[in-house]
Amino acid sequence: MATTTQPAHAEAPQQGGLLRAALVIFVGLSLVTGVLYPVVVTGIGKAAFPAQAGGSIIERGGKPVGSALIGQNFSEPQYFWGRLSATSPNPYNGAASSGSNLGPSNPALTDAAKARIAALKEADPANTAPIPVDLVTASASGLDPHISPAAAAYQVERVARARHLPVERVKTLVAEHTTAPILGVFGEPVVNVLELNLGLGDLK
């Protein structure tokens, strides 16, 4: 009985066609994800949220003094202090955003907290209240511009004394700069340290 011999292999696909299709897909995706999408999102952001899209820059007298999104290093007694910052070589270095990555048993973490406690007590020896934890710890980004209302309240008397201001006026200023949780549910109440310190300059 006669048998039919099958071809050893199917016809090879056209390599040039596959390469052309891959190239078209690559160029198309590059244009969409690398050009079109960023341009559209940036345009929407600038139109809907111009301040945030521009970095939430805070200005005084027409000059930028900082960003509402990035903390600054305050260590003088007449200012409210923010959280510790683990960025290097300088605190609140936006180009080196990171946490300390130190484990809870690492002596360096304990030493940093002890040093901040000592600095807080030296700046206000009469204050015997418990120190809020956010004043002796760094945030995950190292750039957190906020502290808790409790951390601000801990520093009120020191700041008022250094500026020769009534304590109640400084307390009122803290309350005015306290931001409630989003929709009253998401997050915790916070105080922006830079905005609070700028507000101190407006008190007479």
UniProtKB/Swiss-Prot annotation:
In Pfam terms, one family for this protein is: KdpC
Domain of life per record = Bacteria
Keywords, ordered alphabetically = ATP-binding, Cell inner membrane, Cell membrane, Ion transport, Membrane, Nucleotide-binding, Potassium, Potassium transport, Transmembrane, Transmembrane helix, Transport
Q: What is its main location?
A: membrane
Q: Which InterPro entries match?
A: KdpC (IPR003820)
Membrane topology per the entry is:
Single-pass membrane protein
Q: Does the keyword Electron transport apply?
A: no
State which residue ranges cross the membrane: 21-41
User: What cellular component terms from Gene Ontology apply here?
Assistant: plasma membrane
**Any GO molecular function:** P-type potassium transmembrane transporter activity
Function (record text): Part of the high-affinity ATP-driven potassium transport (or Kdp) system, which catalyzes the hydrolysis of ATP coupled with the electrogenic transport of potassium into the cytoplasm. This subunit acts as a catalytic chaperone that increases the ATP-binding affinity of the ATP-hydrolyzing subunit KdpB by the formation of a transient KdpB/KdpC/ATP ternary complex.
- Subunit (UniProt): The system is composed of three essential subunits: KdpA, KdpB and KdpC.
Q: Which family does it belong to?
A: Belongs to the KdpC family.
In Swiss-Prot or TrEMBL terms, this protein is called Potassium-transporting ATPase KdpC subunit
UniProt source species: Ralstonia nicotianae (strain ATCC BAA-1114 / GMI1000) (Ralstonia solanacearum)
The gene it comes from is kdpC
